[in-house]
């Protein structure tokens, strides 16, 4: 059991404590986006995942189905936003939209851009690709083989890190190499956004599977609620596929920040108190970790407080 749950304190207080620490004591910094942040370096959160528990925030609505659709898209290795837009998921739309506007001078609306991505395959191929982001590295990390005379060629099939972790958890649970890495130095420049939630590691203790996520850069107000859900979901899926019980999720942040233009959201959220104990049920066990569908997931006991919004920094 998590020490936080044993103490009787609601799991979400640690998130709110981190938010308050950053907002009240963080260093103000000029960041890549030009928006400005308050930031701390080095943070840790821990969540109990037993009995269906998930780190789903209650002090604002977190759209867990949207986060799940994004996560399942990662597992496909797809890097084009078209499948996401077709499901109404706009998490990644702002980056291709920004590039399209800059290169064409067309001040198209986000809604119209997304609709065109869905309707026009050629347009999506030209403007909807993000480069070799997250899922591509997770399931198709490039491998180069020698062909003689000091030359190399890319192997058709790359490394499927997710499949390798499933295999190692099943056959060598005591290994310290259960890792999924997204930070491919050679391909960073080709990515619309370098991976923020970059390194996942897994640990088996008895029949319990624990997971750790290291995040190099973390937007606490908008990104972290989705990142926590995705990391916990990955632990849950791996546990089910490997006949283990979910244990604990440990989250570690590097540059952990709040954007200055998120002030209204931060102050509203810090005025609220967490409540409830949502649980996630996985309704089906497919033959592979790559076979899950959105219909396989059901959340109960989730009654979040009102929606809070803020702009995304691109």
Curated annotation (Swiss-Prot):
<comment type="pathway">
    <text>Pyrimidine metabolism; dTTP biosynthesis.</text>
</comment>
<dbReference type="InterPro" id="IPR000398">
    <property type="entry name" value="Thymidylate_synthase"/>
</dbReference>
<dbReference type="GO" id="GO:0032259">
    <property type="term" value="P:methylation"/>
</dbReference>
<keyword id="KW-0489">Methyltransferase</keyword>
<dbReference type="GO" id="GO:0005829">
    <property type="term" value="C:cytosol"/>
</dbReference>
<dbReference type="InterPro" id="IPR036926">
    <property type="entry name" value="Thymidate_synth/dCMP_Mease_sf"/>
</dbReference>
<protein>
    <recommendedName>
        <fullName>Thymidylate synthase</fullName>
        <ecNumber>2.1.1.45</ecNumber>
    </recommendedName>
</protein>
<keyword id="KW-0963">Cytoplasm</keyword>
<dbReference type="InterPro" id="IPR045097">
    <property type="entry name" value="Thymidate_synth/dCMP_Mease"/>
</dbReference>
<comment type="similarity">
    <text>Belongs to the thymidylate synthase family. Bacterial-type ThyA subfamily.</text>
</comment>
<dbReference type="GO" id="GO:0006235">
    <property type="term" value="P:dTTP biosynthetic process"/>
</dbReference>
<feature type="binding site">
    <location>
        <position position="313"/>
    </location>
    <ligand>
        <name>(6R)-5,10-methylene-5,6,7,8-tetrahydrofolate</name>
    </ligand>
</feature>
<comment type="subunit">
    <text>Homodimer.</text>
</comment>
<comment type="function">
    <text>Catalyzes the reductive methylation of 2'-deoxyuridine-5'-monophosphate (dUMP) to 2'-deoxythymidine-5'-monophosphate (dTMP) while utilizing 5,10-methylenetetrahydrofolate (mTHF) as the methyl donor and reductant in the reaction, yielding dihydrofolate (DHF) as a by-product. This enzymatic reaction provides an intracellular de novo source of dTMP, an essential precursor for DNA biosynthesis.</text>
</comment>
<keyword id="KW-0808">Transferase</keyword>
<feature type="binding site" description="in other chain">
    <location>
        <position position="227"/>
    </location>
    <ligand>
        <name>dUMP</name>
    </ligand>
</feature>
<keyword id="KW-0545">Nucleotide biosynthesis</keyword>
<feature type="binding site" description="in other chain">
    <location>
        <begin position="257"/>
        <end position="259"/>
    </location>
    <ligand>
        <name>dUMP</name>
    </ligand>
</feature>
<dbReference type="GO" id="GO:0004799">
    <property type="term" value="F:thymidylate synthase activity"/>
</dbReference>
<dbReference type="InterPro" id="IPR020940">
    <property type="entry name" value="Thymidylate_synthase_AS"/>
</dbReference>
<dbReference type="GO" id="GO:0006231">
    <property type="term" value="P:dTMP biosynthetic process"/>
</dbReference>
<dbReference type="InterPro" id="IPR023451">
    <property type="entry name" value="Thymidate_synth/dCMP_Mease_dom"/>
</dbReference>
<dbReference type="Pfam" id="PF00303">
    <property type="entry name" value="Thymidylat_synt"/>
</dbReference>
<feature type="binding site" description="in other chain">
    <location>
        <begin position="216"/>
        <end position="219"/>
    </location>
    <ligand>
        <name>dUMP</name>
    </ligand>
</feature>
<feature type="binding site" description="in other chain">
    <location>
        <position position="32"/>
    </location>
    <ligand>
        <name>dUMP</name>
    </ligand>
</feature>
<feature type="binding site">
    <location>
        <begin position="176"/>
        <end position="177"/>
    </location>
    <ligand>
        <name>dUMP</name>
    </ligand>
</feature>
<feature type="binding site">
    <location>
        <position position="219"/>
    </location>
    <ligand>
        <name>(6R)-5,10-methylene-5,6,7,8-tetrahydrofolate</name>
    </ligand>
</feature>
<feature type="active site" description="Nucleophile">
    <location>
        <position position="196"/>
    </location>
</feature>
């Amino acid at each position: 059991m998590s020490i936080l749950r044993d103490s009787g304190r609601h799991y979400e207080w640690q998130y709110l404590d981190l938010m308050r620490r950053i907002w009240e004591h963080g260093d103000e910094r000029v960041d890549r986006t030009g928006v400005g942040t308050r930031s701390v370096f080095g943070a840790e959160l821990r969540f109990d995942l037993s009995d269906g528990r998930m780190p789903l925030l209650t002090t604002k609505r977190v759209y867990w189905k949207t986060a799940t659709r994004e996560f399942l898209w990662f597992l496909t290795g797809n890097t084009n936003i078209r499948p996401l837009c077709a499901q109404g998921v706009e998490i990644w739309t702002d980056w291709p939209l920004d590039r399209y506007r800059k290169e064409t001078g067309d001040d198209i609306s986000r809604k119209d851009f997304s609709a065109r991505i869905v309707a026009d395959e050629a347009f999506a191929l030209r403007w909807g690709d993000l480069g070799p982001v997250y899922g591509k590295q997770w399931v198709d990390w490039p491998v180069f083989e020698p062909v003689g005379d000091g030359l190399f060629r890319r192997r058709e099939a790359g490394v499927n890190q997710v499949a390798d972790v499933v295999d190692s958890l099943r056959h060598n649970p005591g290994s310290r190499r259960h890792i999924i890495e997204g930070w491919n130095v050679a391909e960073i420049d080709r990515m619309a956004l370098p991976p923020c939630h970059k390194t996942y590691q897994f640990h088996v203790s008895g029949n319990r599977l624990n997971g750790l996520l290291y995040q190099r850069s973390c937007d606490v107000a908008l990104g972290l609620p989705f990142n926590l859900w995705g990391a916990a979901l990955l632990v849950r899926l791996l546990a089910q596929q490997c006949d283990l019980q979910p244990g604990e999720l440990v989250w570690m942040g590097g540059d952990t920040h709040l954007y200055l233009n998120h002030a209204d959201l931060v102050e509203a959220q810090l005025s609220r108190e967490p409540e409830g104990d949502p649980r996630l049920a996985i309704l089906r066990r497919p033959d592979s970790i790559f076979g899950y569908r959105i219909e396989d997931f059901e959340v109960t006991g989730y009654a979040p407080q009102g929606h809070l919004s803020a702009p995304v920094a691109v």
